[in-house]
Structure formats: C-alpha cells, structure tokens
C-alpha cells in the first residue's frame, strides 16, 4: 500500500506555558518519528537557545523580505516580534509521509487552520493564569509590564480554545508529552485517514 501522507501537528498556547519545554521532551524520546519544522523569529535569542535548532533568528528586515516573497505558511507579530513557519519544508516533508510538528503562537495557528484544515491542532494550556505568571516571572528575562502584557494576551488566547481539536494541560511536562503522543497515535487511526488506503487495497485484490 502507498505510504500515508504525513500529519501536520500544530502545538500552540500562551507565551510561558512551556511549549518549547514540552516539544524538547517529545523530541528527546527515542520513539519520536516526527520532523520538527523550525520557526523563524525576530525576537532575541534566549540563553541556551541555538540558531537553526530552536528557531531561525532573523532581523526584522530579513523577515519582512520573506513575507513579501510569500515564504511562510503563517506568520504573526507577537509582543513586538515576528514569528513564522517556512512553507516549503512542511509540504515536502508531509508528501514524503512524515509527520511535521509545529510549535507556534496562537495567532499563527489560526492562519494554519485556514491553509491546512486537516491538520491536528493541540492547545497547550497552563493549570491556571497564576501558574502562568509564576513561570514568566521565573524566567527573569522580562519586566513586570511585559509580563502583564503576556498575561493579558494569554486570557484572549485561552478564549480561542475552540479553534483546536484537543487541549492538553501542562501540569507536568512528562504527562503533557505522553498525552500529545497518544493524541497523534489516535489521529493516525481515524477512519477518514485510512479508509481510502484500504479501499484501494480491496480494489487491487479484485483484479
């Protein structure tokens, strides 16, 4: 039988909810076979991050040139910085039968939903907004004003939860990782994803 086309897995949620931490734990698991689509951003690199591994870090001018060339599946400006997902890698990798994993902002996920309605959308939620504030403060990288801005934005993003297929609460990183892996496995077993393949098998058997 032909290889099944890869699944586009979209993980997003409020800033500070732990998207990057959960994504890293998923890809540290030897059983993970997803391909990670690295996003581009104009924000400053944080301690421990590596260009071309965590993000492609670009200047604002360089990013805007790529926007004009229509090189993104999605892009968004969030708290003064651009974030975007390069388009060609995602399409090529899915056509090869690989699942592609995107870790993006909520505004970007809305754009992906329009272009890839069959993608799998997972919202990573904090146990509470107070818990989210503690995480942001614990980073020690932003002012109180910036943190409050992110909390205000998080309230709006939680209200957009209905755009997603699944919600995973990040109360513990290992549990969140396991839940996401189970969701992806179940998604591959959906009747609408495998039906065409088996119909083709039946037709070929009748020849």
Swiss-Prot record:
PROSITE patterns: GUANYLATE_KINASE_1, GUANYLATE_KINASE_2. InterPro entries: GK/Ca_channel_bsu, Guanylate_kin-like_dom, Guanylate_kinase, Guanylate_kinase_CS, P-loop_NTPase. The keyword Disulfide bond does not apply. Its EC number is 2.7.4.8. Disulfide bonds: none annotated. Gene3D superfamilies: Guanylate Kinase phosphate binding domain (3.30.63.10), P-loop containing nucleotide triphosphate hydrolases (3.40.50.300). Residues 6-185 form the Guanylate kinase-like domain. Its main location: cytoplasm. It catalyses: GMP + ATP = GDP + ADP. It is found in: Cytoplasm. One of its GO terms (cellular component) is cytosol. SUPFAM superfamilies: P-loop containing nucleoside triphosphate hydrolases. GO terms for molecular function: ATP binding; guanylate kinase activity. Keywords: ATP-binding, Cytoplasm, Kinase, Nucleotide-binding, Transferase. ATP binds at residues 13-20. It is an enzyme of class 2 (transferase). HAMAP family: Guanylate_kinase. Belongs to the guanylate kinase family. Essential for recycling GMP and indirectly, cGMP. This is Guanylate kinase. It comes from Staphylococcus aureus (strain bovine RF122 / ET3-1).
